[in-house]
Design a protein with these regions (language model features):
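Non-globular targeting/processing and membrane-anchoring segments
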Residues: 1-114, 131-137, 141, 148-261
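Residues at the C-termini of beta-strands that transition into short coil/loop
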Residues: 122, 144-146
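Catalytic nucleophile loop
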Residues: 112-129
Length: 261
């Protein structure tokens, strides 16, 4: 059955009685519950995926010196990695990755309570990372994979030779990609013996799991307001580069109020 529903426009949007609104809201609620149950089922299937053992000894530059992947866990069992697009000699990080990262500092205390350490990883030097991190005002841990195969092995950085073919390995397929760096989120687990396992990675739109603002936008009448934008995220800026948001418009006078002027 085709369940596609065309989006109603803001102009001339249907306005109905309270009873009819409630009836349609309950219909949507059933769909929302269906989606939530599917979400829960997919999460169970994600946790049930087999793991792959990390055999390579990845070493990262951190503010505390050289650290292995196992040491990035900081005593916890689970490591959540944002593959942040900030390449060597870049003037600044990717705006979309920055939009993701803007959600991070507030959630880290909660992640730690569930045995999860968060870290961002980029190929830029530690000095380049520190400069951009300070500009953004972020506090989360961010390390450099410079000199390591880590980014290449997890298919979020591409060699000139790979790019020259016109097809790179990204998001579990071969596709054209316009840049040498790509976004992603990866998850790792460390057992009692200290062995590290790769349990999950997501790319492309999968990284929206870190974009909580999108979830709130999806509740509003205009949604993400990206339908007429060729590149859906081209509106995103670094949080210190937005033009001032439009001022709230004064409420229009109701007809009965206007007549009392």
């Amino acid at each position: 059955m085709n369940t596609t529903v065309a989006e109603a426009g803001i102009q001339n949007h249907p306005v109905v009685s309270g009873d009819r609104w409630l009836a349609q809201r309950k219909t949507l609620l059933a769909r929302e519950k269906e989606l939530m149950r599917l979400h829960d089922q997919v999460a169970r299937e994600r946790r049930a995926l087999p793991w792959e053992r990390i055999e390579k000894n990845y070493v990262f530059d951190t503010p505390d010196g050289k650290r292995t992947l196992a040491e990035l866990f900081e005593g916890r069992r689970q490591l959540l990695v944002q593959h942040f697009m900030l390449g060597p000699d870049w003037a600044q990080g990717c705006p979309s990755c920055s939009y993701m990262a803007d959600h991070t500092d507030g959630m880290n205390v909660h992640l730690a309570q569930r045995d999860i350490t968060f870290v961002a990883i980029s190929r830029a030097s530690l000095a380049e990372i520190a400069r951009f991190r300070e500009r953004m005002g972020w506090q989360f841990k961010w390390v450099s994979s410079s000199g390591s195969d880590f980014n290449y092995d997890f298919h979020v950085s591409f060699t000139p030779e790979e790019q020259a073919t016109g097809q790179v390995a990204y998001n579990y397929g071969k596709l054209p990609f316009p840049m040498e760096e790509a976004p992603g989120v990866s998850v790792f687990y460390k057992d009692d013996a200290g062995d590290v396992f790769h349990t999950y990675s997501t790319f492309g739109r999968g990284v929206e799991v870190m974009m909580g603002a999108y979830s709130l936008m999806d509740l509003t009448p205009q949604g993400r307001n990206e339908r007429d934008v060729p590149n859906k995220m081209e509106w995103v800026r670094h949080h210190d580069r937005y033009e001032p948001a439009p001022a709230a418009k004064p409420a229009a006078a109701h007809a009965c109020c206007a007549s009392n002027g």
